[in-house]
Regions:
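Exported/periplasmic cell-wall-interacting domains
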Residues: 150-153, 160, 179-180, 188-192
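Short solvent-exposed strand/turn elements
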Residues: 165-189
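Generic preference for hydrophobic/aromatic residues in regular secondary structure cores
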Residues: 127, 178, 196-199
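Secreted/periplasmic proteins that engage bacterial cell-wall peptidoglycan
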Residues: 43-161, 169-170
Length: 201
């Protein structure tokens, strides 16, 4: 990408070489901070630490068989669901309605999965950041855990692990737009940044 395309006959630019620091040096020859093991220390770390999230699966992970307290998700489309078929919002609305903890339909940009936390709070729902509960909605801000940078994502908490990670059910992750529901383990680091929403009985 650059301003001028690379030409085959152009000389390859000389790249800087750096001495690998030993454990007794706090900086390498380029002046980059290193730790006691010689690893580079990022002076401007990201504020978002997501840990390692699991890969989505279309079947319940075997280690959760017999642990879930909620009924398995069904394939019904519940009344009042005006979200586009197959979207994460469509799936979360149906799942929450199925378990008797519905969250109302939100319009416009308020309906984006990543906005559900703020939208629900404005409507008087109980919303807690970083505090998961089984059967609550889980709203991921844009870009978190691989979600769309603009729309974010919404899932439903199915199980809370002792280590602080959670199992969620979600749609529009596997085979986008198909309506297929999948399962995924979300790390405790990611959980800390998620808005959890209690539906209304």
């Amino acid at each position: 990408y650059g301003e001028a395309p690379y030409k085959a006959n152009s000389p390859i630019p000389k790249l800087p070489t750096y001495k690998i620091p030993n454990k007794n040096e706090s900086k390498n020859t380029a002046g980059v901070d290193v730790d006691e093991d010689g690893c580079v220390v990022n002076p401007n770390p990201s504020g978002e630490v997501t840990g390692k999230n699991g890969a989505p699966t279309q079947t319940l992970p075997p280690e959760y068989i017999g642990k879930l307290t909620l009924p398995m998700p069904d394939d019904k489309n519940y009344a009042g669901n005006s979200y586009p078929f197959g979207q994460c919002t469509w799936g979360a609305y149906n799942r929450l309605a199925q378990i008797g903890m519905p969250i109302e339909w939100f319009s416009g940009d308020s309906a984006n999965g990543g906005n559900w936390g703020e939208s629900a709070k404005a409507k008087g729902y109980k919303v807690e950041k970083g505090k998961p509960h089984i059967g609550w909605g889980a709203s991921f801000h844009g870009g978190l855990a691989g979600s769309d940078p603009t729309a974010g994502h919404i899932a439903v908490v199915e199980y809370v692990n002792p280590d602080g990670s959670i199992l969620v059910s979600e749609t529009n992750v596997v085979k986008a737009g198909s309506g297929l529901r999948s399962w995924r383990v979300i790390s405790k680091e990611t959980v800390a940044q998620v808005n959890f929403i209690q539906g209304r009985k």
